[in-house]
Swiss-Prot record:
Family of this protein: Belongs to the BsaP family.
Name of the gene this protein is made from: bsaP
Record has 4Fe-4S as a keyword: no
Statement: the UniProt record of this protein carries the keyword Metal-binding: yes
The protein, known as: Biotin synthase auxiliary protein
Transmembrane segments: none
A single BP term in Gene Ontology: biotin biosynthetic process
């Protein structure tokens, strides 16, 4: 399923909420609580770790990586 996600938030070596490489994280610190609840949009690109431009809207969010393109929460709902 993670392989089906767009590049900025799909399988990558960086955490999309903290920007830290997965192997550098402490156990249990990989996802903030608000992200676990689905209330926080991704802030970092999973592929390159760059900070993304994130726009939060009343109906969702849009995140754009300067190198890997854009992803929208509407696209995520379609994959559920």
């Amino acid at each position: 399923m993670v392989q089906d996600l767009p590049t900025p938030i799909g399988a990558g070596i960086y955490n999309i909420y903290t920007g830290v490489k997965h192997r550098d994280e402490l156990a249990g610190a990989s996802m903030p609580t608000v992200a676990q609840l689905g209330l926080e949009p991704p802030r970092f690109c999973a592929e390159c770790g760059r900070r993304m431009v994130v726009q939060v809207r009343p109906d969702g969010w849009r995140a754009k990586c300067s190198r890997h393109g854009q992803v929208d929460s509407v696209d995520m709902e379609a994959k559920r």
